Amino acid sequence: FSFSMQEVMNTEDGKEWIESSSNNPLNEAKNMKKMMIDISEPIEDDLLRFTADADVIVSGLPMFMSAQAIAEKFSKRHITIQFVPFNPTKEGRATMQPPLPLSKSFMNRVSGYIGQYFTYWIFKDAANKFRKRLGMNPMSYGEYTRAYNRDVPVIYGLSKHGITEPDDWSGDKFITGYWFYDTSSDWQPSQELCDFLEAGEKPIYMGFGSMSNKNPGATTKIMIYALQASGKRGIIYSG
């Protein structure tokens, strides 16, 4: 892709999105919506180019609507992958934010549809602008949920030991187990790291993946303070 998510996360919009996610879900959604509008066009251009000769498109949540537009426009198959339970269900143990997490309830299913409306609202402006470029009508919320819950197979990179497989999901939802990168067979830790690991009890790993931060210095101080207060050793990954 001509686009790097890590680079985007280091922009002011990306940092604002990350900062707002911790204490204000509405601000988080607004910032993510703005960011998607800003970055979606080059991603969609790449999608058009990369899928020109493809029989099947595999998408994640952020580009689901754009991938579905390409699938509809050019008569291609579309599969989506997820790492959190996203399809509505009565099963609280398979609902992302269940009102009744330990029960089967219609309220959990309603919560799932509310969550899908939330994501539809975030992505619809960018995706429907793309559909307009393709000469297509906008995708409504009803069409979004029908595509997500009935028309497009979903593959979950989750374990059945982690979530309960709902009995009210359709047969095209698959929980496959967790996915892992292939490990490099020739990688060796540095001597400095080996010495540190052998010098005491197992350390705590602390890191945020590719996520950026408006004030990395203050965040690092918090992590160091937590290690000192707990009397634990740690390894901090810079990302």
Segments (PLM) and residue ranges:
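A short helix->loop->beta-strand "cap" motif at the edges of active sites that frequently abuts
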Residues: F74-R77, V152, K232
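Generic beta-sheet signal
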Residues: F1-F3, G60, I79-V84, G157, ...
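Hydrophobic beta-strand scaffold residues
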Residues: F1-S2, H78, P138, I204, ...
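Donor-nucleotide binding loops and adjacent catalytic segments primarily
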Residues: L158-G239
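Conserved nucleotide-sugar donor-interacting segment of glycosyltransferase catalytic cores
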Residues: I39-N108, H161-G162
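Short, charged, surface-exposed secondary-structure boundary motifs
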Residues: E7-G14, P88-T95, S184-W187
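Conserved nucleotide-sugar donor-binding subdomain of glycosyltransferases
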Residues: G14-S66, F106-R150
